[in-house]
Amino acid sequence: MDMFVIHGGRRLRGRVRISGAKNAALPIMAACLAADGPVRLRDVPALADVDTMTQLLESLGMSIRHELPADPPGAGLSGPVEECECGAESWDEFSAAAHCADHGPGSAAVLFDSPAANPLQTPPLRLEVVDEAECVAHYDLVRRMRASICVLGPLLARRGRACVSLPGGCAIGDRPVDLHLKGLAALGADLKIERGYIWARARRLKGARIYLGGAFGSTVTGTCNVMTAATLAEGTTHIEAAACEPEVVDLGNFLNRMGARISGLGTPFLQIEGVDRLVGAEHVVLPDRIEAGTLMLAAAITNGDVVLDNIRLEHLTAVVETLRGMGVTIEEFGEAIRVMVRGDLRPLDCIMLPYPGLPTDLQAQMMALLCTVPGISIITDKVFPDRFMHVAEWCRVGASRRREGASAIINGTAHLSGASVMASDLRASAALVLAALAARGDSVVRRIYHLDRGYDRLEYKLKDLGAAILRTVDHPHNLPAGLQVSSQELPPQEVPGSELRGPKWLRRGDFKLVTPEEE
């Protein structure tokens, strides 16, 4: 496994481009199972989860390939660490050179006049179904990510049968698939769960009126699944309490490009007129609002000055207004924003809600920022109330916080200290990276395979902004010197003889110590 070694305390400055959204790309790729013809997708992010979805779709009879060969800098998600631009070959040299003028963006002259010079874009992805015989999505692939469940709807609608393992993903709380099954059953599917798999059959689905509200709001993947299946159903389907997230809208727009008839996208009420077939189409995946929010918080936590390209500002209204309420300066121009910190930030209370509220996928990153803002702040998660597994790691970097139910109470401090920390899930890994960027000294973030699932080459974007960050193999020899602790550093404890007291039976006079002179 790999880990990040980060030298904190550097201001992020520069310009980077936001990649395509993971939470849109995965259900869109799954929906290609229902297409009759080739599909061309652009701006699909280079993620471990995309690789997993690719393997899953190939196992279900789909041909997937990148149209143009490309090997952008840092295209690999793991492997040997590149030498630093300033010539350092080891972490100690890199740390010492972290403030050199040649490393990272050294001046503001080129930061804000033109779009990001190295967008790290992946080539277009071409997907086409070549064999419809296989309908089993096996456990070995599905267990790796929760979005694998999105193949259930298109498989059932197109092939009339499906067998999909119950999904995996990050351990962030209870996320049942009952609403998926409820929606598909309403369309006429015959469903059962047996041996850890969902077994589904239907000759042809039929339109129905479906309510998809749950205990904590609408279901995003459930809406994607049922909406995709309903496009090939006979008649009209009405979905109430549908998820309104931009990623659901992007999937709906993609399905409409393939010939579907979906109206009401972006509202809780969807109307879907069933069609006989979906044809191939071309689509550009929308920008990742969670990656954008993470980098906005990275700029704020380092008192930086960062421009982010390829932004849909209408998807980030809650994030922008929350940061402005803390004292962060945000300038908007076109499809880009500039995030700056020009003074002290203020603590605040925030609640994570379904879209258009503050996204739960930014809860951990927001906590990282609030840990560096002196004063009391409170974060409440109304979407996943148990999504606080990362809280235990914050004490390692000197943060003061405690959890109470669905809330975390944070007593912010101006200075975090570098430490070795371990990620528990995808967004927690990003939050720990942000904390390490702000901390004094060196930090190590372990289990970054979580981060590779949802962030497109994040370390290269942070390097472009001037961060001192290296990916290396997780081994004790690769720890920076500042985090290698030895018992020799502990001085022996000296206790004056006058403070030493004998056992009670000696003090009572029952026995007497005899010195050599007395003998």
Q: In which residue ranges do the predicted regions lie?
A:
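Short, structured segments at the rim of ligand-binding sites
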Residues: 1-95, 99-519
